[in-house]
Amino acid sequence: KLAGTNKMPIEAHVLQAFVTEPLKPLINTVVTWGAGHLYISQSDKGGLVFGGDLDGYNSYAQRGNLPIFEHVAAAAVTMFPNLSRLKLLRNWGGIMDMSMDGSPIICKGPLPGLYLNAGWCYGGFKATPAAGWCFAYTIAKDEPHNLNAAFTLDRFYNGRELDEGGAGPYPAHQ
């Protein structure tokens, strides 16, 4: 039993990202397409940064697989047909800690002085400022802020999942 968290409802999955060769300004915001499960934006250096679906199996490897690349590239070209001739410069895989309901765990842990902030799925990088503020409040006051009060570990054991329509290791897929 590790720190009282031997039953964490989290799985690790690889989420791939890709960068194209630089090009003139094309996209000045982050574009997402829920149905195609794609996000794309343009870096300051001109490369398009895009990604999408998870690899379909649990892994701690920091590399992706070809079928996911093909799926994500096809979604990108569907959204922006002019991308079909761009060269891909690099790709990588990041480990996503996927909770079973698609929502993070931000709460006091099962042991005194232990606090949990995990299971962020796809939203961790984007939600970090607000979540950090709520997490700091939880640690300082030893009680949750109203904004993270529902994001407890015990919700999985009490049948109070937060995103039932997106339950499972693929929260965006129903």
Model-found features: residue ranges?
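Short hydrophobic/aromatic-enriched beta-strand-loop microsegments
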Residues: K7-V14
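ATP-dependent carboxylate/phosphate-activation module, predominantly the ATP-grasp catalytic core
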Residues: V14-Q16, P67-I68
